[in-house]
Amino acid sequence: MKVLLIKDVKGLGKAGEIKEVKDGYGNNFLIGKGFAKAATPDVLRQYEAAQKRKAEELKYEIANLEKLKEELAKVTVVVKKTLGANGSLFGSVSKEEIAAELEKTHHLVVEKKAIDLDTHLKAVGLYDVSIKLGHSINATLKVDVQGE
């Protein structure tokens, strides 16, 4: 019996593979537990259509991330913090503040967990901040920390 694996099965194969198995193993275990479907022409056609749809969605998502990367490269986010008597900042600039200011001033939404601060932004100045957008696409955002 031929089956289309829906999930990875240890010792048999990965999801999406078509395997030849014994009838009892295929019907009772793989199909019964939801690890596979019988490899009928209709099931294979549905699987191929789903794979094409996923590929198109991935292509669209990557194009949107590339567009966002280009937009972020053109933008400088200004974050104003209170200065102490000696000219240093009270605290440091957080990921949340950067994400909020980016959304408020430039209407670009980036999750705070995507912002990668290598060092704490504790002084006034211009910084390059890395943003991990996903699918191995990284953007660089300029952050200008100013005192008030």
From Swiss-Prot:
GO biological process, one term: translation
Short name of any one Pfam family annotated for the protein: Ribosomal_L9_C
UniProt superkingdom: Bacteria
Gene Ontology CC: one annotated term: ribosome
Keywords: Ribonucleoprotein, Ribosomal protein, RNA-binding, rRNA-binding
InterPro entries: Ribosomal_bL9 (IPR000244), Ribosomal_bL9/RNase_H1_N (IPR009027), Ribosomal_bL9_bac/chp (IPR020594), Ribosomal_bL9_C (IPR020069), Ribosomal_bL9_C_sf (IPR036791), Ribosomal_bL9_N (IPR020070), Ribosomal_bL9_N_sf (IPR036935)
Keyword Ribosomal protein belongs to the record: yes
Gene3D superfamilies the UniProt entry points to: Ribosomal protein L9, C-terminal domain, Ribosomal protein L9, N-terminal domain
Single GO molecular function: rRNA binding
Similarity annotation: Belongs to the bacterial ribosomal protein bL9 family.
Function of the molecule: Binds to the 23S rRNA.
Protein name: Large ribosomal subunit protein bL9
Lineage of source species: Bacteria, Pseudomonadati, Campylobacterota, Epsilonproteobacteria, Campylobacterales
Protein encoded by which gene: rplI
